[in-house]
Structure formats: C-alpha cells, structure tokens
Amino acid sequence: MIFTIGYDGLGINRFVQILKENEVRTLLDCRFNAVSMNSDFSKNKLALRLEGEGIRYEHLKEYGVPGKVRRAGNAIEWYIENIKPTIQASIVNRFEQPVCFMCMERSVDDCHRRIILIAMQEQGMQGRDLYPKGEKSAKKR
C-alpha cells in the first residue's frame, strides 16, 4: 500500500498525526527542492521530526518537478511525458512500508503526486491520498 499527501494548510503536528494514523513507516519527499516557506517542512527539520516519530525520511528529487517547469504552467503534462515512464513501483520495495509520497500541494488532483499514484496503480499497487477532506487550514497544530 502506498499513500500520498500534501502538507499545504496542515501544521506539522497534524501532518505527523495523519502519517501515524495510517502507520506510514517511510515518507518519500517528491519535491524537486526539499525546502518550504514553512520551515517545519524543509528537508532537515522535517527529517529530524519524523525520525523522532519513528518514520524514515527520504528525498526523491528525481520524482520532483523543476521550478522552471512549474513556472511555465505545464507541470502535469511535463511530468506525464518525462517522469511517469521512469516511475517503477519496485522503488517502494527499497523502503519500509507503507510509504507515503509527499509534496506541498494540498489537492492530489492538482499535483504531480497524482501521476506517481496512477503509475504505481498501473503496476499493480494499491494506494490513496491521505489529505483530510474538508480539513480547515492551519499554520500550526
């Protein structure tokens, strides 16, 4: 089983709670650049927090969308053409499961992690997005 989640609108405490409720063992950061305006979600700080919760953190830059592509406004199309063919479901076997692919975008429908999820499902894996539907936005929880 694989999961995806975006952190936009979630505080770090709520984010970690969601991961733990779903027994996530490894968080796979699929941002090209693992930095955030919310420092709780920047690579080193996030990895340290997750380690304290018993969740492994890995940055998979190769599954991210470069900034110039995002700024051009065609990230999903670019991702389908350039990255989706390289996605192998077997990558999750390198990590303790279940795994969760993370990006910033709140809605999986507006994010490249949807393409990761589709590619994994096409290869026989089951998965779903964990972002809580109807959750109120919060800076810290």
Task: Describe the predicted segments one by one.
Residues M1-R141:
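Residues lining hydrophobic/aromatic ligand-binding pockets adjacent to catalytic sites
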